[in-house]
Amino acid sequence: MSSWWQKAVVYQVYPRSFQDSNGDGIGDLKGIIQRLDYLAYLGIDAIWLSPVYKSPNDDNGYDISDYQEIMDEFGTMEDMEILIAEAMKRNIRIVMDLVVNHTSDEHPWFVEARQSRDNQYRDFYIWSDPDSQGNPPNDLGSTFSGPAWEYSELTGQYYLHLFSKKQPDLNWENQEVRQSVYDMMNFWIEKGIGGFRMDVIDLVGKQPFKKITGNGPKLHEYLQEMNRATFGNKDLMTVGETWGATPEIAKLYSKPNRNELSMVFQFEHSGLDQQPGKEKWDLIDLSIPALKDVFSKWQTELASERWNSLFWNNHDLPRIISRWGNDKEFRVQSGKMFAILLHLLKGTPYIYQGEEIGMINYPVETIEEVDDIESINMYNVRLSQGYAKEDILDSINAKGRDNARTPMQWNDSKNAGFTSNKPWLHINPNYPEINVEKALEEKDSLFYTYKKLIQLRHEHPIVVWGTYNLVDTEDENIFAYCRVLDEQKWLIITNFQEKTTTFDLKEEPKLSLIHI
């Protein structure tokens, strides 16, 4: 039996940067409500909402101090309830971001846990005595640079944080932790949400003293327990962020009879411009044959029973047109090529805000312009290691997370129609040329390509259910594939070159053209 999310297209909203309704320079829930008609016109089926919970904002909301309250800057719980209801009136479901690998260090659990070694919340987190020299128990590193252990003077122990030191990791070995998470999830399910996107969910089975972080031995046991305790018997979509997933691992998450998740985000294609064995900042040119191999592997391996997620962009990744396309003279053409290539694959496509109008990266000239904690930490570490300042900034401009987080460009008025005040993060100065209002006026704009692709998915079962076959081409810059369902066959051809080219098919196809 099929589920709604198999036919759906999901749109990610980064609330801080989407629409400000009250003039404080920060996007909010009322701003999202104001723009629901725009999203309904685009045709999307669900909104993945980046975190809106109460947070001190060390990591832009991914450090949560109260899971059942709304961040003051974003509005109130009443605003949230109105958003859920108004979206549903437009047949749009709200998918919440579930961040339960860690909390904020300002969450009441951790505030209490750090006070003493014997209080009731101590075991909600992961603590260790220093080694004989007073150092951390091992050399686990934080994703945001530096060690993953922070010393707490108050109790003389280290606590684990795989991200910022203000994001202590929860101890999922503790059944009370797990039950508290499930209770919170049910709180939101009862409010009528459409599902959860699960932040770095592959880390919750960690065994840090064995230096196991991702894909730990109890991970799937925990997810099956979560499924039973919360969403398992409900018509919800669940997608797990799993940076280290292979197709074999992804099958464990998404095979229906295992009762875990609907699908996962895998990032194999996202690492193709990274030097092997190095960090994401260490760049190499994209290999188109490698991209074809990765997409084809995932399309083939997850062809039956399991399900793919399809995406180029999110709040952590640079804008795809700047990353792998031409964001100057061929910006629109690049955007259409990436859209067509992705949206006619099998799986559930995700659009990140602004992707549908071709928003691009915002280059910075100094570190003072950067907001992202990951980029700032990397800058300081690499500067101390002797890297040239210019080279570090080049890496930030290529891969830094602020690229995706610049405010949405609605029109050519001051501050791109995002806010009447100073925006929380710089707005790309190209907004007079790249904005929603202009895209809606131009019938051949990138926006209408996305709208058409969404319509094709809704109207043609071949896009949802058809099998995938890569088409061999002598030109490595051509990515062509077929979708086949019963007697129907679609051929999709995309060209990564900045010029017109031709290639020969081995057999004459019987095709009818669809204009996108």
PLM features: what roles do these ranges have?
Residues I514-I516:
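Conserved small/polar residues in nucleotide/adenosyl-binding loops
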Residues M1-K510:
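Active-site and adjacent substrate-binding regions of carbohydrate-active enzymes
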